[in-house]
Amino acid sequence: MAAPTSKLTPDEDSIRMMLTAKVHIGTKNVENKMRKYVYSRTQEGVHLINLAHTLEKLKVAARAIVTVSNPEEVVVVSARPYGSRAVLKFSHYVGSHPIAGRWIPGTLTNQITQKFIEPRLLVATDPRTDAQSLKESSYVSLPVIALCDTDSPLNYVDIAIPCNNKGKESIALMYWLLAREVLYLRDQLKRWMPWDVLVDTFFWRDPEQFEQKPEETVNTHEEDLMASRPNVPLHPLPDWSTVDPSHANSSDWKVMAAGHEEWGSFVDTRAQWQ
């Protein structure tokens, strides 16, 4: 009788993906309020995050996002470059309002600015790099969800998701899991159905990689043109090493210039026009 095959539960599969993306890798520093999410510490002094708490807080954050009736009133921010693409992809599938890049001061507090918005929920990628948005949210009593590392301050953060918020793979996976959980709760995606969106689409990509591709394509195009040219026989070039016999023994430049007009006989005709 064949042995029964073991199948991972959805939570176990999510934790396996977190381990692959190094979501559990923290920093050498740890905040006092983040100490309860730390599982252990390596010999190098790097703190490891308990992924059970990460998965639990991720589900709590997804429930908070679903409670907002209008998805556009959920603002997702990321001043860190590694999280810009993940924020845009998350907002595309969830329907939230993304702000990738620099946060304009006064977005939540100054009504005169053109970028003024009044959201009901804020999702931040890093409490340190997104400190301006978190500070403004405290002025307007706006609840905040944030991806927090072991050294992240929890000031103005209501729901902290403990994870590695500095790696591009970790940030992409966390937003992918959060978007999938939101779709589960909205009943737009069944839990027994796999999501056809790959995690790779949430990864940040270096713009320099796209700048090098056109040069490579131009070189290959030139090589193809050279290879497609027909083999035309080349005509032999004249031998310039041969010397005219009439000038072989002549060393006088006057003899060499025989038959040519004398340069000294040139008359300036400009005086005639004057």
From Swiss-Prot:
Tagged with keyword Ribosomal protein: yes
Transmembrane regions: none
Signal peptide (UniProt feature, chain positions): none
Stored Gene3D superfamilies: Glucose-6-phosphate isomerase like protein, domain 1 (3.40.50.10490)
Disulfide bonds: none
Subcellular location: Cytoplasm
Pfam family, one: Ribosomal_S2
Keyword hit for Transferase: no
Gene Ontology cellular component terms for the protein in this record: cytosolic small ribosomal subunit
GO BP: any one term: translation
Subcellular location, principal: cytoplasm
Keywords on record: Cytoplasm, Ribonucleoprotein, Ribosomal protein
PANTHER family from the UniProt entry: 40S RIBOSOMAL PROTEIN SA
Subunit structure: Component of the small ribosomal subunit. Mature ribosomes consist of a small (40S) and a large (60S) subunit. The 40S subunit contains about 33 different proteins and 1 molecule of RNA (18S). The 60S subunit contains about 49 different proteins and 3 molecules of RNA (25S, 5.8S and 5S). Interacts with ribosomal protein S21.
Protein's job: Required for the assembly and/or stability of the 40S ribosomal subunit. Required for the processing of the 20S rRNA-precursor to mature 18S rRNA in a late step of the maturation of 40S ribosomal subunits.
Protein known as: Small ribosomal subunit protein uS2
Taxonomic path: Eukaryota, Sar, Alveolata, Apicomplexa, Aconoidasida
